[in-house]
Amino acid sequence: MAASRKSRILIADDNATNVELLEVYLAGLDCETAVAVDGRDTLDKVASFKPDLILLDIMMPKLSGFEVCKQLKGDPATRGIMILMVTALNELGDIERAVNAGTDDFLSKPVNKLELLKRVEIMLRLRHVEDEVERLRRYIEGMEDSTGPGA
């Protein structure tokens, strides 16, 4: 069995104050964090950092959070990454658009620290359960291959 690694959280926000606040809030968690400052940077960091969760702002330069989310959720290699949109937008239409883009959850700014941390914990737990289910699925498929006809 592979050794477990720390959870990885990517903070994607073009506002340095928001990034600093989120980093302070996440400091008590046993996780690694990285920062992306715009939509394209977010996609680049996803490829190199391989996050379990992205805290994604919607209103960013180059690509909006909606566009980033839609691209990530549309790609089989990245669709399993949990996305929590953390944004100043809070109208029902914004939430609907975020859900349609594929977000897993939505949190309006200003964020409450406890609410953010609980949502992050739940989403990371869910991500790890999904990873374990996938690992077991591959294991079972391997067992079936070795016990099938001609084995």
Which residues fall in each region the model found?
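C-terminal output helix
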Residues: 111-124
